[in-house]
Amino acid sequence: MGQKINPTGFRVGVIRDWDAKWFADKADYANQLHEDLRIRKYIEKNLADASVDRIEIERTTKSRVDVSIQTAKPGMVIGKGGSEVEKLRTQLAKLTDTDEKGRSKRVFINIVEIKKPDLSAHLVGQQIAGDLERRVAFRRAMRGAIQRATRSGAKGIKVMVSGRLNGADIARIEQYTEGTVPLHTLRADIDYSWDEAMTAYGNLGIKTWIYRGDVLPQKKNSK
């Protein structure tokens, strides 16, 4: 089961939390879901060069939306004197639905810096995709990503690239593994990502698994 299922969804509720934290009535659910999709799509498109890894959206009231952006380049997102993040907040507010008085929802943005981007599966996959689009040999791109992740402290990493590799006529799959990646162990902190590289010979799929160690339950102090 652990070999087939998405490792992120497999661990939600065990060692990983939801990326969207809100509850809505049946009448409001679809509207809020589409709001989330618009917000995520806008951030991913306009902050494509800011190494954004994860976007969390939380709603405490119907008129407030809290957006947490995890990025390896917080300075690029915040801008000089907070100018860029203020522009982003204004644009995200315009993407939300208005109330009866025509007012948009209040949007609050929290920027979280990623200390070790080489331990993020999405950022590693994006790096490999960028190398492949620049015509770097796929084996060199994969081995370079594995070496950087290992130096950053990864317990294990697996990278899989599929498609017309190096312009071959027949598509195939190549994969490299370093260390251990225990997919069946629920306490194992495994970050997973699927990314895509658009090359002259077609699109290449990139799957990345990074094992960052075990997440053990906190022991309660006995009185």
Curated annotation (Swiss-Prot):
Gene, per the UniProt record: rpsC
CDD domains registered for this protein in UniProt: KH-II_30S_S3
Family (UniProt): Belongs to the universal ribosomal protein uS3 family.
HAMAP family membership: Ribosomal_uS3_B
Organism of this sequence: Leuconostoc mesenteroides subsp. mesenteroides (strain ATCC 8293 / DSM 20343 / BCRC 11652 / CCM 1803 / JCM 6124 / NCDO 523 / NBRC 100496 / NCIMB 8023 / NCTC 12954 / NRRL B-1118 / 37Y)
GO cellular component, one term: cytosolic small ribosomal subunit
SUPFAM superfamilies per UniProt: Prokaryotic type KH domain (KH-domain type II), Ribosomal protein S3 C-terminal domain
Protein name: Small ribosomal subunit protein uS3
Function field: Binds the lower part of the 30S subunit head. Binds mRNA in the 70S ribosome, positioning it for translation.
PANTHER family linked to this entry: 30S/40S RIBOSOMAL PROTEIN S3, SMALL RIBOSOMAL SUBUNIT PROTEIN US3C
Assembly, per entry: Part of the 30S ribosomal subunit. Forms a tight complex with proteins S10 and S14.
